[in-house]
Amino acid sequence: MGNDRYNAVVVGAGPAGSTAALMMARNNLSVALIERGKYPGSKNMTGGTIASMPFQQILPEYWNIQGIPLERRIVSDELWLLDNDSAVRIGFTGKKFGMAPYNKHTILRYKFDRWYADQAVKAGAKLFTSCLAVDLVYHKTGPLSKKVDGVMLE
């Protein structure tokens, strides 16, 4: 990264960090997206879900995007309340859950995070991998002494 200057530095290229970088880059801000792994998602061993309604606001009709690493459509949700010797199950489904716009999708984070960070890069963000942010650098004197001037990297 050197002494490059950015309007924003986002630490972590998971879904939240990539969303922040993508939205700022779309709005013509210079953004550095810092990821400690060799690539976004390289440190993830689990999956997750993408809820359709909020994600469509970021990437409209995302389920039609070529190459997006979605796994399965989720057509029902269940919530289990457990006690030592009993359980209550509450389920919800809808006739339209299996039709576009789909309710939600499962993802494997090691695939999805890499793809999603690439969307931020295509929008103009700069991705730095194998890069660990260890501290903030503050403006040293004056009324702006609490203003962040930079990020210290390991």
Where are these regions (language model features)?
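N-terminal Rossmann-like FAD-binding beta1-loop-alpha1 element of flavoenzymes
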Residues: 3-33
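Short, basic and Ser/Thr-rich N-terminal targeting/leader segments
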Residues: 4, 73-75, 129
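Flexible, glycine-rich phosphate/dinucleotide-binding loops
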Residues: 17, 40, 88
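Short glycine-/small-residue-rich flexible loop motifs, especially phosphate/cofactor-binding loops
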Residues: 21, 52, 117
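N-terminal FAD cofactor-binding segment of flavoenzymes
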Residues: 27, 37-85
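Feature captures the FAD/FMN-dependent oxidoreductase FAD-binding
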Residues: 79-154
